[in-house]
Amino acid sequence: MGSKIVSDANAFVKFLKLCQDESKDNCTYMDDVSVLLVKKEQLLHDIIGEKNQPIFICEKAQTKYEPEATETSADTSDVEDVLFKVEQDPGPQPLSIMKARQLLSWYTMAHNPNMSRLKAPENLHPLWVRCDKSDPCATAWLGVEITYSGNKTSGVKLYTVCCKGPTGDETAFTTLDELKQEHQNRHHTSAVSTKGYAQYNLFCSLTEESLMFESQSSVIASLTWNHVEKMLECPPLSSKATLNIKVAVGDIRSPLYQTYREMEFLLALAGGLRTGEIEWLEPVETQSAVDLTRALIEELENLAHGVPGHSAKASEKQKAKPDAAFSSMVIERGDLDFTEQLWEKMRKSVTSYQDITECMKIVVKAVKLGKIKPWIHKDSNSTLSKLILQSYQQQIDSVPLTGLAPANMLLELGLDKIRKDFINYLVGKELTTLNYLSYYLDTEVDLQEQVVRVRKLHHLLEILGTCSTFLSLPHERLFLFTQSCLQYYKTSNYDEDHIFQLQIKPALISYFYEKEQPFSWAVEVSSGQGSKEVKTSLYLSDKPLVDHIHLDLDVSLNESVNGDSEKMFYYRTMVSCSLINFI
């Protein structure tokens, strides 16, 4: 073997080892190759499978644009052109197939124990190279990882990822028999097994007009099964199914939209107290907060004096929109006490701190003078509730109503009321117990932390609303899922982007997907076991699984314009693996 090849291979693996030891995220090799050390390349991870170690990614080094020195009187358009070029980000760029194969050959030769003049450092991460698909197979990735027999290097696995543009013509897909034959020819085996994967967006199975509204929420059903019989087959009921649920609050189709509006005011008020700045929500009521508060006090006074025609309102129910895409999920209660009714009126009408102060002064004065002795829940924890309880015994403490004290009192009312709403639903529906909710109901922590915890409960209820009303999941699944979500939010920050997972029987959700087309479908043909296992896979997806090359639409213009709009167009990604043994 030529000394030049040996020298180049040794230099390359030593460079990789240096990057690995120094944990360098991005290094440049020989001016034209960028070497990235990454913990996880998401698109690659999706098609290769679970790999829990970092990898090297080689790609074309991008030339940094450095503008030439210009006279200070340069034309403005030239300056704008320079700025445009600097700001452009072309994204990752591939290497040629020839260059990619050279890098993989250096890596492979250096690990071959039979090559006495080559010595690879120990425990080198796997290597992946972005390719420009200029070969007949349209190769987009080449990869290599080491296999071991005990502690000794026994060989390498070489991976090839080939991609083709989207098509709706199923006759253009590789058939299952062709995929099996490809695997058997490559690995000289007759015994193969197959495994299928499919993903469905269950929200897409709804046809209500309300789905015209763009939603940040999603319910993705992921199914896996063995013994695939044909391409794009519907997963059998024996599959393993997982729901991946992400719910963003504030969707007007949600049965909890009115609860969201209530939380929106609570969060705005809490934010104002925390930062000193608040953007008041548009009032729902036409009357002022002060007038509504006076009317509530007057109503209670008339009731106390037995004036005919007056009765205390038991609740201020806000029903979900009748045209919601989901069926109803009632959170509101019918037993609102005085402080809760006051909260309801004020949250819909206050537009300033002055409003809050005036309203609180009216209420406190009426309580101190004994004009009203309203009913309140015995477990109420707010300052105003305690004041009312004291009024029953004619022993009332002094309450400061200056500065931000009234706003804090209002925040307490909101927290008390919303907590009771949530307890009423979760415990009333037997989805959890007060003991499991103790973290979320703790009033010993400061008000801002109480708001954070109530906000987490609200997000949980939005998720349960999706599961119970849209998916109609049975109680036993909702109960276990509720405990899982409660446990998660005890130690995690509020996060609407978090994906909650729920294992489920396919029969419970088959109604949603059996007549739908999956947005992602894959079949895997495999043979061998352990480190000797090799796979050949085909992925069909509605989005490309590579991000560094352009994939043309594999369909005629006439078909794309006049074709069936219901037809799914799939990108095709083939992943093959070769096992090379050194010993």
Curated annotation (Swiss-Prot):
One of its GO terms (biological process) is cell division. GO terms for cellular component: RZZ complex. InterPro entries: Zwilch. The keyword Cell cycle applies. Essential component of the mitotic checkpoint, which prevents cells from prematurely exiting mitosis. Required for the assembly of the dynein-dynactin and mad1-mad2 complexes onto kinetochores. Component of the RZZ complex composed of kntc1/rod, zw10 and zwilch. Belongs to the ZWILCH family. PANTHER family: PROTEIN ZWILCH HOMOLOG. This is Protein zwilch homolog. It comes from Danio rerio. The gene is zwilch.
